[in-house]
Amino acid sequence: MTKHDHGLKEKVEGTIDKVKGEVKEVVGKVTDNKKLQAEGKWDKVKGTAKDTVGNVKEKVHEYKEHKENK
């Protein structure tokens, strides 16, 4: 990803973390592995945070572009 990805990197990483977390959580439930369930929940939280950062970067970029075009 480039310096000018405007939050795309974080959004992609966030989605990957959320999917990875969901898989870990489900496998943890099926195997009755509480540690794996907890790791899955934590990965989903990290993914949501990264996704939010990506959205904020995207909105900041859109705002700056809007201000420059006035």
UniProtKB/Swiss-Prot annotation:
InterPro entries from the UniProt entry:
CsbD, UPF0337_stress_rsp, YjbJ_sf
Look up the domain of life of the source.
Bacteria
Listed Gene3D superfamilies = YjbJ
| PANTHER family listed in its UniProt record | UPF0337 PROTEIN YJBJ
Similarity comment text for this entry: Belongs to the UPF0337 (CsbD) family.
Q: What is this protein called?
A: UPF0337 protein BT9727_3385
